Amino acid sequence: MQRTRELESSVAIDQTEVPRSRFFIMVKKLSRVADIVYIVDTFLIPPLHPLKKQHPKVAKFLKVQLVFDLISLFIFATHQLLLLEDGNFGKHYFKRKTKRCSKFSCSRCNANAHHPKWFKFKHSLLCLGTFCFGVYSLVKINKFFKTDQTVDLNRLLELFFWQLNAILNMKLFAFYGDHLESHSAPLDVYEDSFANKSSSGGDEV
């Protein structure tokens, strides 16, 4: 009886959900691409204004860069307006679900259960270190042509090194942050989740 009530409630929730239009889905996908383009253009490409005097052709690239930025901002604004119209703007930004590890047996969860303070300290330190190195790389990229306007193969390889370093450190920051969030839940949370899984499995059998 309880199982049928849960199914009825889930069906009722599904009926209240409004199906997404094709235009909304297309704008959502374009918004993700536009975000990547804007982030790369803003943070990973150094300001090219100091090169205008020595390299006049840079002005054309700056115009193209401005067009891409405007298109990205337009797509981003359109996506936000669609979220407001759909009523999911706050849910999209402020109601993010907490990540939890779904593995029945996990070495990281066991490490957190036995040494919770050390687990949180280690992952917090890794997050802080990767974040600081990533920000330092972004600062070096931002000042790359401001301090020296030389453009040659060695300088471009140096720029590529800082760009790669920034990407890797930010990826590692997100990786360790996800591990810190998903594996640092209290032990009773996992016990409750496993109990719910086993009880639901028993009902199905």
Swiss-Prot record:
Q: Which organism is it from?
A: Saccharomyces cerevisiae (strain ATCC 204508 / S288c)
| Localization (cell) | Membrane
Q: What is this protein called?
A: Uncharacterized membrane protein YIL089W
Does the record's keyword annotation contain Transmembrane helix?
yes
Main subcellular location: membrane
Q: Which residue ranges does the entry give as Cytoplasmic-facing topology?
A: 1-63, 146-205
The way this protein sits in the membrane is described as:
Multi-pass membrane protein
Q: Which GO terms describe its cellular component?
A: endoplasmic reticulum; fungal-type vacuole; fungal-type vacuole lumen; membrane; peroxisome
Pfam families for this protein: DUF4668
Going by the UniProt record, its keywords in alphabetical order are: Membrane, Transmembrane, Transmembrane helix
Q: Where exactly are the transmembrane stretches of this chain?
A: 64-84, 125-145
Q: Which residues lie on this side of the membrane: Extracellular?
A: 85-124
